[in-house]
Each structure stands twice: as structure tokens, then as C-alpha cells.
Amino acid sequence: MYGATNDVNALGVVLSSSMATPSLDEEMAVEVASSENLPWMCIVWDDPVNLMSYVTYVFQTILGYSKKRATELMMQVHTEGKAVVSSGERDKVEADVKKLHTAGLWATMQQGG
């Protein structure tokens, strides 16, 4: 191929640079575009204050989970230290975090993947 350059490394392997490589700006644009499309997650963290029954109650009343699902999420928080309890658009997840804070739970949000 005209204009292609070949280099040989220390092991004698021919390294060809004939393939086009994206510029740094193109790589960053792809990364930004894909991260903007990721959903947001509301994460509840284990704390030493709230009873397990209360956390289950909050998941039912604030997030609308059934008793069974609320209990599963509470047990995940208790055993693993955290659980994703909701996800979606940033505004919705931010509202969930605020409601959980009002109820006294430790909650944060992050963009997921």
C-alpha cells in the first residue's frame, strides 16, 4: 500500500501502521456520546441506624415495591452493603434519592453501565 509504513519490533515482528486510527477527539466524542445514554441508578447503602423492617417499609411505600421485592432489596442492602433500588432518567432517580433521604435512608445516584 502506498504511503504505509512498516516497523519491525525487537522480536522481528512487522508492525504495520496502514490502518487508520481515530484521533483523540473522535475517541472522546464516542465516549461522551455513549455515557450520556446510560441510565441513572439510585443506590441505597447499608447503615447502622435503620431497622430492616423499616427499610422494607420505605421501599414499599416510597418506591412502590411489593413486600416480597422490598424484602429482597433490603436483604441485598443488609448482606452486600448496597442495592440498586431504581433506575431511569436522571430527574426520576434524583427524586427517588431525595424521597429516600427524607425517609432517613442513605442513598446516592450514579450513571450506570
From Swiss-Prot:
It comes from Corynebacterium diphtheriae (strain ATCC 700971 / NCTC 13129 / Biotype gravis). Coiled coil: none annotated. Involved in the modulation of the specificity of the ClpAP-mediated ATP-dependent protein degradation. Belongs to the ClpS family. It holds the Pfam family ClpS. SUPFAM superfamilies: ClpS-like. HAMAP family: ClpS (MF_00302). It comes from the Bacteria. Binds to the N-terminal domain of the chaperone ClpA. GO terms for biological process: protein catabolic process; proteolysis. InterPro entries: ClpS, ClpS_core, Ribosomal_bL12_C/ClpS-like. This is ATP-dependent Clp protease adapter protein ClpS.
